[in-house]
Amino acid sequence: MKIGIGNDHAAVELKNIISEHLKERGCEVVNFGTDTSESFDYPIAGYKVGKAVANGDVDLGILICGTGVGISLAANKVEGVRAVVCSEPFSAKLSRMHNNTNVLAFGARVVGSELAKMIVDEWLDAEFEGGRHERRVNLLNEIDHTRGLKVRSEEHTSEL
């Protein structure tokens, strides 16, 4: 599996730890972030990883900034990206199973390296369940592609 990883200056150390962890798992890692502690604008890394995921240059993306929020917002501006910010493993796992997320973000100032590895592992090991979740992801894709949503009353059930 080929993983694109991006970060800002606040997350260099954690990016390096996660990159090594991914390599130990047998993943190929492509670095789209910075390797120095000099100020680096997180939208650049978020966008680059998002584009790489959307274009199919990498299979999945991982983003790390101070909180994970800003960098994920940048990635989510790229059509086809479903980035999630997670600070614990359960949400990471369910984001893949239910939302088919393709980019994971977390904060270097929020989680430590061991927790970050657990979040990454749960996210990578989870698989999209499809079923009722497929319809919901399709609705997200419709919003992404059209910047709108046409929900017909017969399709809007209590399950939705």
Regions found by a protein language model. Name each.
Residues 1, 5-24:
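Glycine-rich phosphate/diphosphate-binding loop of Rossmann-like nucleotide-binding domains
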Residues 155-160:
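Conserved small/polar residues in nucleotide/adenosyl-binding loops
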Residues 124-153:
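Internal, active-site/partner-interface "lid" segment
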